[in-house]
Amino acid sequence: MSEVENIIKRARIAQKEYESYSQERVDLVVSSVAWAILEPGRNRELAELAVRDTGLGDVDDKFKKNFRKTLGLVRDLQKAKTVGVVAHDPLTGITEYARPVGVVAAITPSTNPGATPINKILNALKCRNAVVIAPSPKGLTTCARLLQFVHAQLDLVKAPRNLVQMLPDPITKDATHELMRLADLVVATGSQANIRAAYTCGTPAFGVGAGNVLVIIDEHANLVSAAQKIAQSKTFDHATSCSSENGAVLLDAVYDSAIAALEQAGGVLLDAADKQRLHDVMFNNGKLTSTLTAQSPAVIAERAKLLHPKAGSARFFMVEETGFGPDAPFSGEKLSPILTVWRAPNFQSAKELIAHVYSFQGAGHSVGLHTASSGAVMEGRADDLASHLPVARIIVNQAHAIATGGSFENGLPFSLSMGCGT
């Protein structure tokens, strides 16, 4: 019997015991396990480990992300009924019962080696499942430390430790694929190669959509507010989130003013020569490399040898683009504080441009709009985008990376795994 088979065997034994828990006891387990990362000292340690071992992101932002995303998820799960009868329609006589799926294989990325695993763990436990984490190789140490905290919290409520396990070191593709094949459900967050592997493993699977979020700034927008929100989102955790804006489409009527507002918010617009220097480091034969992924602007400026006089003090960089697709790699996802900027004559042209970009990369995820704060214009344009673009969410007048995956300021549920729909 392989090591993965042994892990699955232990998970099934633990899950069978857990399946008999009442709703009250399940909720106690979820609340206890959430403290594995909500406790400030543990959270700080995990944030520091994540940045140290992966080389990605920012410690303070990961601390905030770990706390906010976990607290929001606990809030969302708190009142959800997941044991026994969950719905009954006396008119049709139909009664719905909640049943666990069994063992969940949770594939997690290096960009969020603490926040994404705990998110998947809590969702699985809420539904009386066991879960096995397949972390990225770089995120293994962070995940292992998280599971030590999780097991301590399971001990406190006398729940089986084997409800939550992870693949052992070294993390290999073969072990991850075996886990996906043997589990009852796969929930995959990570590279598109991992998502494709999840969908073709023969086990029911949920996979995230490819990121490449674009946002429109139209002639009705509060430009200062829009620029500040884009900067907040673009710089958070050095843009590790797939919900971070990768590009902005600015309408002609406000183009120069919007660029000025973005510069005031800390952006630095690079000239063609610096754009080429950035390109030469970021891409290899049109494919994104990891050289600048989730790095600070200062590191990016140094590695790309940027010559702009403000490059060293930038909060984020901007590059102008006119095309899209493989021949315009800046039109794709960059996972770094680099914002691609397009100019469009009007709203309809902006919408059509985004549709073209998403046909290259980003379909199924989300789009942003900065426009009037209320009224027919805002509602009409949001409706237009929702009706015509291949996205799951339209985020209006908000910092995209903060809002898309759930926020205390909007009604969206909290998640670190944005599905791509059908």
Where are these regions (language model features)?
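Rossmann-like NAD(P) dinucleotide-binding subdomain of oxidoreductase/dehydrogenase enzymes
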Residues: 82-225
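Conserved C-terminal structural/oligomerization subdomain of aldehyde/semialdehyde dehydrogenase
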Residues: 19, 28, 307-422
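Structural signal for hydrophobic packing residues in well-ordered secondary-structure cores
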Residues: 12-15, 19-22, 30-41, 50, ...
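N-terminal Rossmann-like NAD(P)+-binding subdomain of aldehyde/semialdehyde dehydrogenases
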Residues: 1-95, 123, 264
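ALDH superfamily catalytic-core signature
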Residues: 118, 126, 195-325, 350-352
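Flexible, glycine/charged-enriched surface loops at secondary-structure junctions
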Residues: 20-25, 45-47, 160-163, 236-242, ...
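Short, flexible turn/loop "capping" segments at secondary-structure junctions
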Residues: 7-9, 207-209, 237-242, 328-335, ...
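Terminal low-complexity tails and localization/encapsulation signals of metabolic enzymes
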Residues: 62, 84-88, 92-101, 297, ...
